[in-house]
Design a protein with these regions (language model features):
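Metal-dependent phosphoesterase signature
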Residues: 15-35, 60-69, 83-86, 96-103
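Short acidic capping loops at alpha-helix termini that bridge into adjacent secondary structure
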Residues: 27, 88-90, 128-132
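Substrate-recognition element of Asp-dependent hydrolases with the DxDx(T/V) motif
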Residues: 37, 41-74, 87-99, 145
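Short, electropositive alpha-helical surface patch
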Residues: 62-78, 103-117
């Protein structure tokens, strides 16, 4: 089976402005797409990457938002992307809380495994882990990438993981992440 490079993106803090501490973004009017997102998405697609959003949304398990509310928010996000000539190839959500003992909540790699299965089933390709990355703004995102066996970019922090055969970068935002990843792939 052919393998292809994939970019996995956390949502809050990478795609959109993060919510205030202990709050959740559940409505479109609170969803502020960060500068450079569409430019980064276009750069990745132009260079042969598939792009998936992988996001923990425990607001669902806590009853703060329904799955359909989050789906609607993501529908509006993808429509906004389309108006700006960019897109993602899929969105994978963990609706569970910390103590639900699921396989999908980051730092577990379940969301990335779901995306991999989607690629294998729908396109007959798999993830090339040596050329794939997760971009996130938390240690949990970075740990998920390490647990899945891919390279990581931590936005706004210092990488925790070192010397495990993978690349670990830092960046100010998604656009700088794209430039660093693409610069290193040439």
């Amino acid at each position: 089976m052919e393998s292809i490079p994939v970019i996995f993106l956390d949502r809050d803090g990478v795609i959109n402005s993060p919510a205030k501490s202990h709050e959740y973004i559940t409505q479109w009017e609170d969803f502020i797409i960060l500068p450079g997102v569409c430019e980064a998405l276009r750069l990745f697609h132009d260079n042969g990457y598939k792009i998936f959003i992988v996001t923990n949304q425990r607001c669902i398990s806590r009853g703060i938002a329904s799955s359909s509310q989050i789906d609607e928010l993501h529908r509006m996000m993808t429509e906004d992307f389309a108006r700006n000539n960019c897109y993602v190839d899929g969105i994978f959500i963990c609706p569970h809380g910390y103590n639900d003992n699921c396989d999908c909540r980051k730092p577990k790699p379940g969301l990335m495994l779901q995306a991999q299965k989607y690629l294998e089933d729908s396109e007959g390709v798999t993830v090339d882990k040596t050329r794939s990355w997760i971009i996130g703004d938390s240690k949990t995102d970075e740990e998920a990438g390490v647990n899945y066996g891919i390279n990581t970019v931590l936005i706004g922090g210092d990488p925790v993981s070192k010397n495990n055969g993978m690349k670990h970068l830092t960046a100010h935002d998604i656009l700088e992440s794209a430039m660093k990843i693409l610069e290193g792939s040439n």
